[in-house]
Curated annotation (Swiss-Prot):
GO cellular component terms given for this protein: cytosol
Pfam families: Formyl_trans_C, Formyl_trans_N
EC number of the protein: 2.1.2.9
Taxonomic lineage from the root: Bacteria, Pseudomonadati, Pseudomonadota, Gammaproteobacteria, Alteromonadales
Designated name of the protein: Methionyl-tRNA formyltransferase
Family the UniProt entry places it in: Belongs to the Fmt family.
GO molecular function (one): methionyl-tRNA formyltransferase activity
Domain of life: Bacteria
């Protein structure tokens, strides 16, 4: 197998892990594209992306155009004469002229088993929907949103204990090896491309903070999935006495209740049992305003009065509950 000359385009830590795998592979990373440095922290100093930092550590040239629609940026890309471009969480749109520039085009690492969950938040949406599995798809990029031909897919069982944070870590481990395997197949011309079945496609829209407001009229099962999907961002929450209370961990209780949805049934060190539209949800970890996430046992030591049996956990600003 002849090694490929690769351009890598990516920005966050998830992308940097894939770049590391490419650096360690037999292929040659000839240039890295990443988003422009952004002001960060209290001092608002310009901060490099994790991908840029890794590239510089390995003496790989870094390019940071504000847009790839710019003709000068496109000429720079063409001059690199790359075999292929690998795109992982880059954050800039690649116009068709860019997709067509490398000899073998551009490939992308996507955090779902396509065509299910195209779009920005595949990990969170899979959890929220109650999917049994997820995975990584390596695909040939076209001008659509995650619509290109599939080159390689991996599978990962979603565990009851998984949150978006844990699934992210698992897929960040799975993706790099899948990418290197796919590149080997591309270099040897042994990797067949599979068209996506449009009838099975759906979209994973970016999460919003509004979606994370807890609606106690939903079932305990739905809320349990939601809380896991919104961990670590934007975190499921409700309002109580004008305070936003975040819920980090929960499970579906075997208890039953005829109380109105959002009513506290009982509270002890093992959890706070809340009636829902169907079933009982046990909350085990929460976060009070200005505090860090704590176990319910710790929270009840200081705020047991907020969670006495019969308390209504309302979700409207200003409700006194």
């Amino acid at each position: 197998m002849k090694p490929l000359n690769v351009i890598f385009a990516g920005t966050p830590d998830f992308a940097a892990r894939h770049l590391q795998a490419l650096i360690e592979s037999q292929h040659k990373v000839i240039a890295v594209y990443t988003q422009p440095d952004r002001p960060a922290g209290r001092g608002k100093k310009l901060q490099s992306s994790p991908v840029k930092a890794l590239a510089l550590e390995n003496d790989i040239p870094v390019l940071q155009p504000k847009s790839l629609r710019d003709e000068t940026a496109q000429q720079e890309l063409t001059a690199l004469n790359a075999d292929i471009m690998v795109v992982v969480a880059y954050g800039l749109i690649l116009p068709k002229v860019v997709l067509d520039t490398p000899r073998l085009g551009c490939i992308n690492v996507h955090g779902s088993i396509l065509p299910r969950w195209r779009g920005a938040a595949p990990i969170q949406r899979a959890l929220w929907a109650g999917d049994a599995e997820t995975g990584v798809t390596i695909m040939q990029m076209d001008i659509g949103l995650d619509t290109g031909d599939m080159l390689l897919k991996t599978q990962l069982k979603i565990e009851d204990t998984d949150t978006s944070a844990t699934l992210y870590e698992k897929l960040a481990d799975q993706g790099p090896s899948a990418l290197v395997e796919a590149l080997a197949g591309i270099a040897a011309d042994t990797l067949p491309a599979e068209k996506q079945d449009e009838s099975l496609a759906n979209y994973a829209e970016k999460l919003s903070k509004e979606e994370a407001q807890i609606d106690w009229s939903k079932s305990a099962e739905a809320l349990w999935r939601e809380i896991r999907a919104f961990n670590p961002w934007p975190v499921s929450h409700y309002q109580h006495a004008g305070n936003t209370i975040k819920v980090w961990q929960s499970h579906v209780s075997e208890k039953t209740s005829t109380a109105a949805a959002g009513t506290v049934i009982s509270a002890d060190k093992n959890g706070i049992d809340v009636a829902t539209g169907n079933g009982v949800l046990t909350i085990t970890s929460m976060q009070l305003p200005g505090k860090k996430p704590l176990s319910v046992a710790d929270i009840l030591n200081s705020r047991a009065d907020w969670f006495t049996a019969g308390t209504q956990l309302n979700n409207a600003m200003g409700d006194q509950g």
